[in-house]
């Protein structure tokens, strides 16, 4: 999530499943529920939320890899920065 977040940066998470495009979502990895991912919400799709990382061209897991994120996998979102 660089440039928004640096590797290892600690974050506050607002516990909610209410998202909108532009939010930064915190969710369980659909491929391994023990992992937690942080990605930007792009849009709502049938079956869930389309999320993407901020580094284009990188082969990091996002909805291009695992498809839309089921709303039940959402743990929350990061507070909006001013």
What are these regions (language model features)?
Residues 1-82:
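Extended hydrophobic leader/signal-anchor segments used for secretion and membrane insertion
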């Amino acid at each position: 999530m660089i440039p928004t977040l640096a590797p290892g940066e600690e974050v506050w998470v607002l516990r909610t499943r209410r998202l909108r495009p532009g939010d930064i979502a915190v969710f369980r990895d659909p491929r391994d529920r023990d992992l937690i991912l942080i990605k930007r919400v792009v849009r709502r799709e049938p079956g869930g939320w389309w999320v993407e990382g901020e580094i284009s061209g990188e082969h990091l897991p996002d909805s291009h890899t695992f498809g839309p994120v089921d709303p039940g996998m959402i743990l929350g979102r990061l507070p909006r920065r001013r």
